[in-house]
Amino acid sequence: MIYGNALGAPAQSVQIPALVRQAKASGVARHIGRGLNRWSNVHIADVAALYTLAIAKAPAGTFMYVESGEEALAEISKAIATRLDLGAPQSWSAEQAIAAWGRNMAVFSLGSNSRVRGKAAADLGWSPTQRSVTRWIANELT
């Protein structure tokens, strides 16, 4: 999950804007089921820094994952609810999520796990400057 405010087009990532749109439209931030599914995440500026480093230093054909941590979707929806001054986030079923977000978004993006480790990036000398998606939501989400 890449988060942060980008400067180019499109200026939004996928998951967090979908969660925010739904929360604003309904007045309730939501997660699917218990929200225990986890996603590795990284700030867009840290991704850009890794691209720059990889172009300069990585051998051709190098494959890298990039992450600065991971978070459960329940914690992300809680941070969104707090930022938007809503009540506590609420769970909804997969069927409700599919009706709102469509099957691919609900099942593969907001209802699944995506956990990686950025070992190759770290071995290259990359280190993230932003480490918390929930802190970014609390302080910078617009």
Per-region residue spans from a language model:
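Amphipathic terminal alpha-helices
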Residues: R131-T142
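A conserved pocket-lining segment of Rossmann-fold NAD(P)-dependent short-chain dehydrogenase/reductase
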Residues: A18-V42, L50
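Conserved C-terminal active-site "lid" loop/helix of NAD(P)H-dependent oxidoreductases
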Residues: I44, A74, A99-S127
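Mid/C-terminal beta-alpha module of Rossmann-like enzyme folds, strongest
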Residues: L50-M105
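Glycine/proline-rich active-site loop of Rossmann-fold NAD(P)-dependent oxidoreductases
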Residues: G4-P17, L53-M64
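Positions that flank functional sites
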Residues: R38, Q96, W136
